[in-house]
């Protein structure tokens, strides 16, 4: 009967472009794809005789997915390009089981110069600056701030955005005071050109910094010399060692993919003025039952790296190999940036060699990662708790409050083998009980899935009730996220937390688990829970201190602790109390107290 329903749904497919979605019997999203012709594309997944089943001509991954499929949905679009953009958005937001999700939602910094200014200076941005005479350099995947500091250390350029008289940088010979007309614009621009040349040629900057470090050491200014030494080390780390001579002073980008032993590696080179100025690599472990899709990866990689709100410095993108939607991506990027963008596969010459180099480095990154990390704990968690995903990206949640005061929530993130502190999040909460607080935190996180892709696993500090709550929110979001909860053992109806040795219980959608205190899986989950708890407690303590300080100000006005608590209970925070209408305050705490608040 179920397959009959699916067969009827197949008959409704139009001959237009669009996005299709496959669901299993539990209503979970299995796969998102795009099509130039929905009817032809979707029907190619199936064989219709004697009964509806997976087309044996497709890959094993696709056949397995189709055997699980009981329902499909589609969205028709005006063009295949629109369908591709929508497909990418769905994959990022919903993380379907059989799609590979690249988790790189970061925006990387650019160094730029605004030549509209009389005396231009270097600045950092992560977005497009809406001015006509901007020159960008980057993106820099690491060390942008240190590189900027190194430029300002050696080249005496203006550092402050606005300055009417010589500042401290002039006094220490780090600026030539253009604000006071102590240098002409022509001479200043000559120094700026030298600095730009050094930015594009790190070896030049290194030589200059090494000279400066030597002078500082000879003058026994060892502290400053040590700072320069550290900057030299950072710039050496930034350099991409390439034995390829790029004859022309071109700007272009290079992408390559490698896949080995269920690990995907992506690599990107940024080339400006014929020099590789930065490189970025990413490692993504893939479940054994998913075959990697080269076309799918290139689409995600290029669309995510060339979003509308960043500067596009190169008109040409070189890729290591051909992929199905290359021409379609050219069309999308050309429309997005209102100029011709080409995606090419070089066959010979220096461009071919640099693409080969990118691929070789992507392979080396896989070997390096597998030497350092074998993903054992992730594989054990997936097998033992029967998870859908290999839990490489884990978000862990905890709340903290003191009798309904300073209510906060916290989320920490663990990726592959380390904490990703750039993804930690703090939440000020309105509710006072643990259940409603966790609902508030998880709902706010789920609403952000379109901006920050969902993880593989949520780990909740709590029991079955909070596990069921998390399931409700994930089902509502439509995302593919596994859920575990960890609760402290209860003795005499009291929960006990003994760091590292507590007999915690693990709750999954499959049941409840009591593991030995020596079990590596339990110890790993405890480590995750303890970090979330530490982060939540720290945020709670800081919030409480701030609230106590503000509370003491109201107390100094002569308001009793009871009145202050009444105000907080009603308005939620001190800012709202001070902004409250006088009449409302009078109704709540009386005219005398209201006057004290508004007068101060």
UniProtKB/Swiss-Prot annotation:
The keyword Magnesium does not apply. GO terms for biological process: nucleotide-excision repair; SOS response. SMART domains: GIYc (SM00465). GO terms for molecular function: DNA binding; excinuclease ABC activity. Keywords: Cytoplasm, DNA damage, DNA excision, DNA repair, Excision nuclease, SOS response. Gene3D superfamilies: GIY-YIG endonuclease (3.40.1440.10), UVR domain (4.10.860.10), UvrC, RNAse H endonuclease domain (3.30.420.340). GO terms for cellular component: cytoplasm; excinuclease repair complex. Residues 15-100 form the GIY-YIG domain. Signal peptide: none annotated. Disulfide bonds: none annotated. It holds the Pfam family UVR. Coiled coil: none annotated. It comes from the Bacteria. PROSITE patterns: GIY_YIG, UVR, UVRC. It is found in: Cytoplasm. InterPro entries: GIY-YIG_endonuc (IPR000305), GIY-YIG_endonuc_sf (IPR035901), GIY-YIG_UvrC_Cho (IPR047296), RuvA_2-like (IPR010994), UVR_dom (IPR001943), UVR_dom_sf (IPR036876), UvrABC_protein_C (IPR050066), UvrC (IPR004791). Belongs to the UvrC family. NCBIfam families: uvrC (TIGR00194). The UvrABC repair system catalyzes the recognition and processing of DNA lesions. UvrC both incises the 5' and 3' sides of the lesion. The N-terminal half is responsible for the 3' incision and the C-terminal half is responsible for the 5' incision. Interacts with UvrB in an incision complex. This is UvrABC system protein C.
